[in-house]
């Protein structure tokens, strides 16, 4: 009963949002026939969002460039979910296009970080399936 009520409320909210956000094209009066007026606040928000997304993508790429790709992929295969992580070089364009807006990599587990001495920290250790996730996104 409560699941049906929740579904009805969700549908009502979606319909209300769709009706409220409908643009008013073709109205009478000067300027209304060419669409909505662009507001300065919306333009500033869009620019700030784009800059935030670009900065987040660069920070995420820098964190993931320090990861040991072989350990990450081995962990993915142990979990039954192979990771599509390949060392293709700088990841800024990849993550700028692939990540959802304002979704950044928060941390990389120390097990998967590159060692300054050549190998990875967990190179000879077998990663257990109850290990922490390699990459956490917020």
Curated annotation (Swiss-Prot):
Per the record's keyword annotation, is Metal-binding included, yes or no? Answer: no
* Localisation: Secreted
The cross-references to Pfam families, in alphabetical order and at most eight, read:
Chorion_S16
> Quick check: keyword Signal in the entry?
yes
MF GO annotations: structural constituent of egg chorion
Q: Which UniProt keywords apply?
A: Secreted, Signal
Quick one: signal sequence residues? 1-20
| Gene Ontology CC terms | egg chorion; extracellular region
Q: Which GO terms describe its biological process?
A: chorion-containing eggshell formation; dorsal appendage formation
The UniProt family comment states: Belongs to the chorion protein S16 family.
What the protein does comes down to: Chorion membrane (egg shell) protein; plays a role in protecting the egg from the environment.
Mind telling me what this protein is named? Chorion protein S16
Organism this protein belongs to: Drosophila melanogaster
